[in-house]
Structures are given as C-alpha cells and as structure tokens.
Amino acid sequence: MAVFKTTLWWLISGTLGIICLSLTATLGILLKNSFTKLSIEPAFTPGPDIELQKDSDCCSCQEKWVGYRCNCYFISSEQKTWNESRHLCASQKSSLLQLQNTDELDFMSSSQQFYWIGLSYSEEHTAWLWENGSALSQYLFPLFETFNPKNCIAYNPNGNALDESCEDKNRYICKQQLI
C-alpha cells in the first residue's frame, strides 16, 4: 500500500510540474508578444516577399500600415499612376515615400517589386526634387543624372531605382513621419 501511495504522489506531482512549465512558457510568449509593437493587420497583406522586422517602441500606426523606425508606411498592393499614388497618399495625411537613407526600407529588403516614390523632376528648378521640395541627395541614387526628366521614379527596396513614365502604373509606398 505504501508503494502505491508513493507512485500516485509522483504521478500527480509530475503532472502538475508539466502543467506549471507549460503555463510558464505560455506566459513568457504572451509577455514577449505584448511588448512588441509592430502594428500590422492580417488584412494588410503587403505581399509574400515582404519580410517585417521589429519596430522600435516610438510609434503606433493606423490599420493596414507598417510601423518601422518611428515612421508608418503603407505599401500598396494595387497599381496606380504616379499622380494617382500621390493623391491617395495625401488623402491619408501622408506623402509618397521620401527616402532619408538607403537603409530606410530594410524591413522590405526581400521585395523585388518597384514602387512609386515621391521623387520627380522639377523643370522650374531643373532638378530632381522630393514632394516637399527638398533636393535629392546624390549618394542615394548615384546615377540619377541618367534619369529622364520627363519620368517619375520607381524604387525597389533592394536599392534600385528606375525612371518610368509617370503614366505607367506601379505599386506605391506612402510614408507618415511620426516624429
């Protein structure tokens, strides 16, 4: 009878131990996920080739937008002309992407798509300008002198840029700066 009580006690304590370990692991996973503030909704579907990385803790983006390095990005899955893209971004209180540096879109580095960005040629200033009127830094696109001034710029997150007719249809990236 004593052997039976000891075996039963070991069985019960072993089962309770496994339950405690499972609950601890689940709690750890839930806590880790609650501190990650990557705001992306399943309905967004930026495409199978976009790989998201952790967001910094300084931003919260609206539904269907991706938060990364204190900015919010909308990565379209539909194709529009450059002007249509610009107007759609403006309607969301944002602008077509203005790149600050070549690392800005690291979270999309596996994408092969080209997207309209907010860079176009100003005949008035005879220069490539961002939507906000600032000049293009030469280090971003070293070969920008070869771009056709009658075109707009489509950008690939791998760092490639193409000049294409502004009437062509491409996907686009809107950017909202939070800070």
Swiss-Prot record:
Glycans are attached at residues 83, 132. Pfam families: Lectin_C. It is a single-pass type II membrane protein. CDD domains: CLECT_NK_receptors_like. Natural killer cells. It is found in: Cell membrane. Residues 32-179 are extracellular. Residues 1-10 are cytoplasmic. GO terms for cellular component: plasma membrane. Keywords: Adaptive immunity, Cell membrane, Disulfide bond, Glycoprotein, Immunity, Innate immunity, Lectin, Membrane, Receptor, Signal-anchor, Transmembrane, Transmembrane helix. GO terms for molecular function: carbohydrate binding. The chain crosses the membrane at residues 11-31. InterPro entries: C-type_lectin-like, C-type_lectin-like/link_sf, CTDL_fold, NKG2/CD94_NK_receptors, NKR-like_CTLD. GO terms for biological process: adaptive immune response; innate immune response; negative regulation of natural killer cell mediated cytotoxicity; negative regulation of T cell mediated cytotoxicity; positive regulation of natural killer cell mediated cytotoxicity; stimulatory C-type lectin receptor signaling pathway. PROSITE patterns: C_TYPE_LECTIN_2. Disulfide bonds join 58-70, 61-72, 89-174, 152-166. SMART domains: CLECT (SM00034). Residues 68-175 form the C-type lectin domain. Immune receptor involved in self-nonself discrimination. In complex with KLRC1 or KLRC2 on cytotoxic and regulatory lymphocyte subsets, recognizes non-classical major histocompatibility (MHC) class Ib molecule MHC-E loaded with self-peptides derived from the signal sequence of classical MHC class Ia and non-classical MHC class Ib molecules. Enables cytotoxic cells to monitor the expression of MHC class I molecules in healthy cells and to tolerate self. Primarily functions as a ligand binding subunit as it lacks the capacity to signal. Can form disulfide-bonded heterodimer with NKG2 family members KLRC1 and KLRC2. KLRD1-KLRC1 heterodimer interacts with peptide-bound MHC-E-B2M heterotrimeric complex. KLRD1 plays a prominent role in directly interacting with MHC-E. KLRD1-KLRC1 interacts with much higher affinity with peptide-bound MHC-E-B2M than KLRD1-KLRC2. Interacts with the adapter protein TYROBP/DAP12; this interaction is required for cell surface expression and cell activation. This is Natural killer cells antigen CD94.
